[in-house]
């Protein structure tokens, strides 16, 4: 097991809505997530001989705090997505072409794992499989065309054969635990919300038009609900991963994505608009929500990520305020969905307000996707990444040159590949994605207590550090003048003035060094002049022992 420690200060941040900026300094520890052999996914289809012992199950689609084990180690519930899947060619049957995905392990069952973090690393040693209401294990296979939640994809095996659909299939993402100990999960297909008991058996399911607002059916395929959390008062919140694509017309112009609130008792829903900064992304659809976590009834932590307009990847955590956000459930624009509205037409609508809290990449984060976020009872921020079970599609052409499988069309009748209408020989296998699965814990740095020293003592300390200065007090102008290169000699009680941990209010006096004012507060305590040591060091460059 491995862990790594990163530390940095937040120096710059941008604010997309008019809110105060919240800044903090954190230390991050990253733990590689190991999975017990018994929980790995059996697989032997790699031509290169990877994955001896099976695929490492990807418990990285969401995370929530569970508590502590008997040794005091923190534990978390983490959820998989639909299971191992990889890019595939477009699939043509009888002249109809569909998008497709390769499911090398079609029997995989989406699961909830228990992650234990120790000083040595993180490990998943137990898991709960998800089941339908009758207790049958579900799969992560897509839904058939025509059903709410269908992505239009064909599910294929390694030989490009169709392997069918699952009307109960789930692509699970967010996770939270309610007051009764039940799990709530969200799904990217539908989007769906599901409530399962502690054993993983389905209790309730919500879909667009069946417990959820119908407009959610316009999610971009495979971009349904990506984040879920439960507020302290019990409201279930779920975030759509990207902007809606209403009638296939709004994914390139919409200015916001939606956060849905469900009252699990009354079944009433509300929707809030989370703003997308169109100046940051070349397309609004490139902005993706990774997960959400409720700090209180109206404040969230939210992962926003995606490829920026300059081509770089971004993974950021925002603090989101819903207290003044307006319920947009019944709002339209010129008789159509609100997604059709240009930004200037939305100025009077109360969007969620957001402020940058953490830029993950400033701490050394390199994974493409941060997909889970929560907090511990100690206020630590926990983030988990999804490495897609550590697999990728490997494609080579007839000359043995690596190529991109998504550039090809596979014809189900002739069992041949083509590219740009020209038949080609292609070899397809599953390779290793070496991106590690990790869980990161961010702890806010504790501030060292302030130390206040008298100006006279500061002069003595400066001299010892090789920066001699003299002192002159001018009560007429309320100034203390320090002159570099001149030695200050103290006598008597001046030497005995001790550092203080606290002082009174700021005085009117000012500190002048070589004719220039030093912009730090000056205090008077028992007739002596004091300054904060750290502030003096920062302003002068001195290192005072």
Predicted segments — roles?
Residues 449-545:
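Primary recognition of N-terminal secretory signal peptides and signal-anchoring hydrophobic helices
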Residues 24-451:
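Sequence/structural signature of beta-propeller domains
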Residues 2-3, 195:
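A general lysine-centric signal
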Residues 3-23:
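Sec-dependent N-terminal signal peptides of Gram-positive bacterial secreted proteins and lipoproteins
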């Amino acid at each position: 097991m491995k862990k790594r420690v990163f530390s940095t200060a937040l120096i710059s941040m941008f604010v997309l809505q008019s809110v105060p900026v919240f800044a903090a300094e954190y230390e991050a520890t990253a733990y590689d997530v190991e999975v017990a052999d018994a929980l790995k996914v059996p697989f032997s289809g790699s031509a290169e001989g990877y994955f001896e012992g099976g695929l490492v199950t990807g418990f990285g689609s969401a995370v929530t705090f569970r508590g502590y084990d008997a040794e005091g180690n923190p534990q978390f519930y983490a959820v998989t997505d639909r299971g191992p899947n990889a890019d595939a060619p477009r699939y043509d049957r009888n002249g109809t072409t569909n998008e497709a995905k390769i499911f090398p392990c079609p029997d995989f069952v989406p699961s909830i794992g228990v992650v234990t973090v120790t000083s040595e690393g993180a490990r998943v040693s137990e898991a709960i499989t998800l089941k339908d209401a009758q207790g049958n294990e579900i799969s992560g296979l897509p839904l058939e065309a025509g059903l709410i939640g269908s992505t239009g994809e064909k599910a294929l095996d390694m030989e490009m054969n169709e392997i069918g659909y699952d009307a109960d299939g789930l692509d699970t993402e967010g996770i939270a635990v309610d007051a009764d100990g039940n799990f709530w999960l969200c799904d990217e297909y539908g989007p769906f919300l599901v409530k399962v008991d502690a054993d993983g058996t389905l209790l309730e399911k919500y879909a667009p038009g069946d417990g959820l607002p119908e407009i959610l059916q316009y999610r971009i395929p495979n971009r349904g609900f990506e984040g879920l959390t439960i507020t302290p008062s019990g409201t279930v919140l779920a975030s759509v991963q990207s902007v809606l694509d209403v009638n296939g017309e709004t994914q390139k112009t919409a200015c916001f994505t939606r956060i849905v609130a469900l009252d699990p008792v009354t079944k009433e829903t509300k929707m809030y608009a989370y703003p997308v900064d169109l100046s940051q992304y070349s397309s609004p659809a490139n902005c993706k929500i990774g997960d959400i976590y409720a700090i209180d009834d109206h404040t969230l932590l939210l992962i926003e990520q995606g490829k920026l307009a300059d081509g770089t990847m971004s993974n950021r955590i925002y603090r989101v305020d819903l207290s003044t956000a307006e319920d947009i459930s019944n709002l339209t624009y010129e008789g159509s969905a609100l997604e059709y509205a240009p930004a200037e037409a939305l100025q009077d609508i109360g969007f969620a307000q957001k402020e940058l809290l953490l830029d993950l990449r400033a701490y050394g984060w390199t994974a493409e996707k941060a997909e889970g976020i929560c907090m511990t009872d100690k206020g630590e921020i926990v983030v988990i990444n999804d490495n897609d079970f550590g697999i990728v599609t490997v494609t080579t052409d007839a000359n043995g040159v690596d190529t991109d499988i998504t550039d090809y069309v596979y014809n189900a009748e002739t069992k041949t590949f083509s590219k740009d209408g020209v038949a080609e020989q292609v070899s397809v296998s599953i390779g290793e994605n070496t991106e590690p699965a990790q869980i990161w814990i961010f702890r806010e740095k504790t501030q060292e207590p302030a130390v206040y020293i008298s100006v006279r003592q500061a002069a003595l300390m400066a001299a010892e550090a090789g920066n001699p200065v003299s002192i002159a007090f001018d009560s007429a102008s309320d100034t203390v003048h320090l002159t570099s290169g001149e030695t200050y000699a103290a006598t008597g009680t001046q030497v005995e003035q001790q550092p203080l941990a606290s002082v009174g209010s700021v005085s009117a006096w000012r500190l002048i060094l070589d004719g220039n004012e030093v912009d730090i507060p000056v205090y008077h305590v028992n007739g002596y002049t004091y300054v904060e040591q750290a502030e003096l060091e920062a302003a002068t460059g001195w290192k005072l022992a």
